[in-house]
Design a protein with these regions (language model features):
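A membrane-topology feature that recognizes alpha-helical transmembrane segments
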Residues: 1-164
Length: 164
């Protein structure tokens, strides 16, 4: 993997709780909070400055801007929610350029697993464990925070284990 194990290990304890929070709130309320996105961004801005070479740090910050602009366009087109776009932008700097192909495969697998699990639980008695979740009522929308948060968390875990 292109991400260094050291960077992944430093990011992981701060980022993983946010990923879990985003997955939970998106399933429960169908929204990703601005606070979660801002904290995720702040963690990278603060830790990344010490963990990455300065030129890499700046390129990764640029990826945040690029993903945010693309996300805004996709949101305006009705393809994705605003919270999803903001979270993807805040998550972008954590991803090493050399890991993009791996990330896409990881995201697709996570998205399929999240969709199958969420839809499967929706139609089983397990739904009674959280009967008030808004995502159960949605027919056309899916809580992408479940897949996005899981993808970033798994990526950092894999980076900590197998990073360069």
């Amino acid at each position: 993997m292109a991400i260094s194990a050291t960077a992944a290990l430093w990011f992981l304890p701060f980022v993983l709780p946010i990923c879990l929070y985003v997955a939970f709130t998106d399933m429960k309320q169908m929204r990703i909070t601005n606070q979660a996105v801002l904290v995720l961004t702040a963690i990278f801005v603060l830790l990344g400055l010490f963990l990455l070479p300065f030129d890499t740090y700046l390129w990764r910050l640029l990826s945040l801007v690029v993903v945010l602009v693309v996300g805004i366009v996709l949101n305006a087109a009705g393809v994705m929610g605003a919270g999803d776009a903001k979270f993807a932008a805040a998550a972008a700097p954590y991803i090493a350029w050399g890991d993009l192909r791996l990330l896409m495969v990881l995201f697709m697998a996570t998205l399929l697993a999240a969709a199958a699990t969420h839809r499967g639980v929706k139609y089983t008695p397990l739904r009674r464990l959280a009967p008030d979740w808004q995502s159960w009522q949605e027919t056309k929308k899916f809580p992408m925070g479940l897949a996005l948060g899981t993808t970033l968390g798994l990526y950092l875990i894999l980076g900590a284990l197998f990073g360069g």
